[in-house]
Amino acid sequence: MTSATLAGRRALVTGGSRGIGAGIVRRLAADGAAVAFTYGASAAEADKLVAELTADGAKAVAIQADSADPVQVANAVEQTVSALGGLDVLVNNAGTAYLAPIDEFPQEEFDRVVAINIGGVYSAIRAAVSHLGEGSRIINIGSINADRVPTGGTAVYAMTKGAVASLTRGLARELGPRGITVNNVQPGPIATDMNPDEGEFANAVRQTTALGRYGHTSDIAAVVSFLAGPESGYVTGANWNVDGGFTA
């Protein structure tokens, strides 16, 4: 562990077995939190991450759940509470994308993108909120596409992330009197296995960022860790663009 700023905190990260989610799980665990995370299909990836964190002395639990299914999401929350003894931090990271022009967008793909990117966030918060006490944190992982849509075919994805930003603001008002903060982290171009930082497209993206580079999962995880910790207690209802100046 690198620090103990989150010692005693119990966190659930949806979609935490790979990419940005795995980066968040690693950072929260390194900062002292006990962490549960959900995964979709790859039990091998999830088990490997649990083994890695456990070897480092962290408490980690992997839970299989389809974020498009409200029942599975609710069950994941209950399993987290049972395994960790409670819940203080919910990070809604699970998401999906399907890119196509609107007149070529399959209805079944539209339904699934909405079910995961909006429904999954709603379902997790609805199930978790009764377990969250004063000082708890809800952190949504949105996208800078909620504010800027630079290419065609991304309208549906951007719509879902815009909905998450609106939900964040509304719930910040609703849950503020209970001492629960709600914030939205909006990543820009982040290098992952699904979003490589090499190739012609990546070179074009780099030219649109103020810093001239892709971000790393650790860049997102650092902001999430701050929002999960004690020093962010007066921060709520905010959209945090972590994008290297992509939206500047």
For each of these PLM feature ranges, what is it?
Residues S130, R173-P177, G233:
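Alpha-helical segment proximal to the catalytic Tyr-Lys
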Residues A43-A44, Q64-A76, Q107, S218-D219:
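The beta1-alpha1 cofactor-binding region of Rossmann-like NAD(H)/NADP(H)-dependent oxidoreductases
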Residues A210-I220, E231:
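A conserved structural motif in NAD(P)-dependent oxidoreductases
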Residues I125, T160, T168:
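Active-site helix of classical SDR
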Residues S143:
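Residue(s) in the substrate-gating loop at a strand-loop-helix junction
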Residues S17-R18:
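Conserved glycine-rich cofactor-binding loop
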Residues P101-I102, P106-V114, V205:
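Substrate-binding pocket helix/loop in short-chain dehydrogenase/reductase
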